[in-house]
Amino acid sequence: MSNVHELNFLKEKIQELKDQGVYRQLPVLEGPNEAESILNGKKVINLSSNNYLGFANHPRLKKAAIEAVEKYGVGSGAVRTIVGNMDIHEILDKKLAEFKREEAVMSFQSGFNCNAGTIQAITEKGDLIISDELNHASIIDGARLSRADKTIFKHADMNNLEEVLKANRDKYRNMLIITDGVFSMDGDIAPLPDIVGLAEKYNAMTYVDDAHGSGVLGESGRGTVDHFGLHGRVDFTIGTLSKAIGVVGGYVAGSATMRDWLSHRGRPLLFSTSLPPAAIAAITEAINMLMTTTEYTDRLWDNAKYFKAKMSQLGFNIGNSQTPITPVIIGDEAKTMEFSRKLLENGVFVSAIVFPTVPKGTGRLRCMVTAGHTKEQLDRAVETFKKVGEEMNLL
């Protein structure tokens, strides 16, 4: 007889999700993550992937990964501070710094633990973290791990941010303003020039999580800082290596001092095995490609503008997105989930985003258009949206 707890309290919570119509099961992808993929045994147009540039199954990245496995093996075998810091890790960090036009970079195992580890390492008791209210969960968790005080400012509200800075400038040793570069649920871009201007006025540091800006905005995907021409004015820039780059990992770009400190106090670096050689090699190849051509980012933006125009013409509410992220805002959580299920039945996979990821009453289908989509695929997706929208009396 098992002594494992029944976890009835969790069963009750799961039943609540089912009663609310927001319970979901993990979809199973069979094969590579591409514009058309096999999901749960069915071929679908994939509008849910963060694979912005189509790099996740690119032959050049796969070739680089295979060659790295043959030379270095399948794993690094240790944390970076012991014997898991291979020469290719150092090469990647230097390549990323060159790409981002920063002095130095430290790469991490994921974007999430990059935020969680960096925020905790660069702040302490006597500091103040000032965070946009819509920042990513990894920023929230990173701030929770810090001993610094925390406060939020209204989303992209510069008047409110200045009020917070003015009220606290004499109370703390350091103030750190944290913002997403691109907000993942709405696709809007942070007013970074204004944020940097206020930071300089009140002697605060700036920290930009550019998970959805890296590989998308700026010259050939150099990010939000590059997009606004703010090099040398942002203290910390976070990027992921799993979205536009198509592999896995994250990094923080900034000063050599920052990198040196994180090698001593960045807890994910100290206590978790470093990225495997195959991932490092594939990432390096992706960065090489972005540094030599704008082909992929150009195609991404062309597809995004095409899809947005088609959806707007149908009368869907796509919010105020300024990036390829295209939210189709339904509102009601149960209807949002139903819309997603009906799309899947008709061969289009789009994730339903509902509370608690977004506020109640703002459920949406987050469409992720990529460089890998063809116009024909996007047209089929739009027609499917139209069909389901009419069936549900939403058009």
Swiss-Prot record:
The keyword Transferase applies. One of its GO terms (biological process) is biotin biosynthetic process. Its cofactor is pyridoxal 5'-phosphate. Substrate binds at R24, H136, T357. Keywords: Acyltransferase, Biotin biosynthesis, Pyridoxal phosphate, Transferase. Its EC number is 2.3.1.47. Pathway: Cofactor biosynthesis; biotin biosynthesis. Gene3D superfamilies: Aspartate Aminotransferase, domain 1, Type I PLP-dependent aspartate aminotransferase-like (Major domain). GO terms for molecular function: 8-amino-7-oxononanoate synthase activity; glycine C-acetyltransferase activity; pyridoxal phosphate binding. InterPro entries: Aminotrans_II_pyridoxalP_BS (IPR001917), Aminotransferase_I/II_large (IPR004839), AON_synthase_class-II (IPR050087), AONS_Archaea/Firmicutes (IPR010962), AONS_Archaea/Proteobacteria (IPR004723), PyrdxlP-dep_Trfase (IPR015424), PyrdxlP-dep_Trfase_major (IPR015421), PyrdxlP-dep_Trfase_small (IPR015422). It holds the Pfam family Aminotran_1_2. The modification N6-(pyridoxal phosphate)lysine is found at K243. The keyword Transmembrane helix does not apply. It catalyses: 6-carboxyhexanoyl-[ACP] + L-alanine + H(+) = (8S)-8-amino-7-oxononanoate + holo-[ACP] + CO2. It comes from the Bacteria. Belongs to the class-II pyridoxal-phosphate-dependent aminotransferase family. BioF subfamily. Homodimer. Catalyzes the decarboxylative condensation of pimeloyl-[acyl-carrier protein] and L-alanine to produce 8-amino-7-oxononanoate (AON), [acyl-carrier protein], and carbon dioxide. This is 8-amino-7-oxononanoate synthase. The lineage of its organism: Bacteria, Bacillati, Bacillota, Clostridia, Peptostreptococcales.
